[in-house]
C-alpha cells in the first residue's frame, strides 16, 4: 500500500526502541518520510512540529505522556493529526484522546494495514 503525494514528515514518538524502529521502517517502505523520537520532550525540542503532517504517539511514556503532548500542541495552536498507540489503553483513555482531536486510538499489537490506513486518513484531514 503506497501512499503517494506526501512530502511532510510523519513523526513517531514512542519510548520503545523496537516499536520506533518498526514503525519507521513500515512508513519508509511505503514511501513516507518518517522520523522517530524517544520521548515527547525530544519531539518538542526538535522543532519539527510545524513540518509534521501526522504524529504517531504512544500514550504511556516516561515524562510527558502522549495525551500531555497532544494537549501541549493544541495549546500552542499546532494541530497535528494524531494516531495514538498503546499497550495499556482503556475506553476512558480512548474517549479522552478522541475528544482532544486524535484521528485514531489503536491497541498494540495492531495490524500494519490498519495503521497505514489511519495514516492515510490523517494525511487527508
Sequence positions of predicted segments:
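A Lys-centered signature of the CheY-like receiver
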Residues: 108
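Active-site beta3 strand of CheY-like receiver
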Residues: 50-56
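Non-catalytic signal-transmission and effector/linker regions of two-component phosphorelay proteins
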Residues: 1-11, 17-18, 24, 113-125
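Two-component/phosphorelay signaling modules centered on CheY-like receiver
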Residues: 17-35
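Acidic catalytic/metal-coordinating carboxylates
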Residues: 38-39, 65-68
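Active-site residues of response regulator receiver
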Residues: 58, 86
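Receiver (REC) domain active-site loop signature in two-component systems and cognate sites
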Residues: 61
Amino acid at each position: 500500500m503506497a501512499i503517494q503525494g506526501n512530502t511532510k514528515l510523519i513523526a513517531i514518538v514512542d519510548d520503545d526502541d523496537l516499536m520506533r524502529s518498526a514503525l519507521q521502517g513500515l512508513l519508509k517502505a511505503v514511501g513516507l518520510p518518517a522520523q522517530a523520537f524517544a520521548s515527547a520532550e525530544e519531539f518538542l525540542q526538535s522543532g519539527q512540529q510545524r513540518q509534521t503532517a501526522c504524529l504517531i504517539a504512544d500514550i504511556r511514556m516516561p515524562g510527558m505522556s502522549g495525551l500531555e503532548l497532544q494537549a501541549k500542541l493544541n495549546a500552542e495552536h499546532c494541530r497535528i493529526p494524531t494516531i495514538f498507540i498503546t499497550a495499556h489503553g482503556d475506553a476512558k483513555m480512548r474517549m479522552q484522546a478522541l475528544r482532544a482531536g486524535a484521528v485514531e486510538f489503536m491497541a498494540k499489537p495492531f495490524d500494519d494495514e490498519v495503521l497505514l490506513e489511519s495514516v492515510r486518513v490523517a494525511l487527508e484531514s
